[in-house]
């Protein structure tokens, strides 16, 4: 069994902003145990039209393929010992529960370097799984380079099924999306405020 790590250049407005700010070629990292690359896990937005509200999610390939144009990716393969495989199966099985206490760390993604308990960005989650801290996607990319198995357009590996049933495609609209964003940041700030007193929500 192997762990597959995918760096992607997403065709979203937020993805473009991140790449311009960081100077990186890619702006997102996703993980999977599926050799067919049809479903991933990551920390990212819940729905397409609310970019700063998210958590620990499942990412069907359609999330990357639904927009027109190529989807540049780099994919890496890491062989896993049996005990690590079992641990990752259990960890990945927890993805997709929107009621979970695990949140997307929008504050760190935007401005801060603090680690807020129970919160991750896609990069910090990959760091957590790999057991090594990476400060940028470029640093992660360099570390994984010897394990690359593919570089190019994701469409050459995975076909868009046309399925749009994933919650990602259920738009919230401006008013509800704005309210979701206010609530999300309020929770993050509250956690940050009591960070030294609260119990960490462990991922492992």
Language-model-detected regions and their locations in the chain:
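Cysteine-nucleophile amide-bond enzymes
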Residues: 1-204
């Amino acid at each position: 069994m192997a762990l597959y790590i995918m760096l992607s250049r997403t065709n979203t407005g937020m993805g473009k902003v991140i790449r311009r700010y960081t100077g990186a070629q890619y702006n997102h990292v996703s993980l999977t145990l599926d050799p067919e690359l049809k479903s991933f896990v990551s920390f990212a937005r819940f729905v397409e039209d609310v970019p700063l509200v998210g958590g620990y999610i499942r990412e069907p390939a359609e999330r990357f393929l639904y927009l027109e144009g190529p989807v540049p990716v780099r994919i890496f393969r890491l062989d896993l010992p049996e005990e690590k495989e079992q641990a990752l199966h259990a960890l990945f099985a927890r993805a997709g529960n929107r009621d979970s206490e695990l949140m997307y760390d929008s504050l760190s993604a935007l401005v801060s370097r603090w680690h807020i308990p129970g919160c991750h960005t896609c990069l910090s989650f990959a760091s957590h799984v790999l057991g090594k801290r990476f400060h940028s996607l470029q640093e992660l990319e360099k570390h994984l380079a010897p394990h690359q198995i593919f570089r190019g357009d994701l469409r050459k590996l995975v076909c868009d099924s046309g399925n749009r049933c994933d919650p990602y495609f259920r738009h919230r609209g401006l008013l509800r999306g704005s309210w979701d964003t206010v609530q999300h940041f309020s929770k993050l700030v509250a956690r940050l405020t009591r960070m030294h007193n609260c119990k960490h929500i462990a991922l492992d």
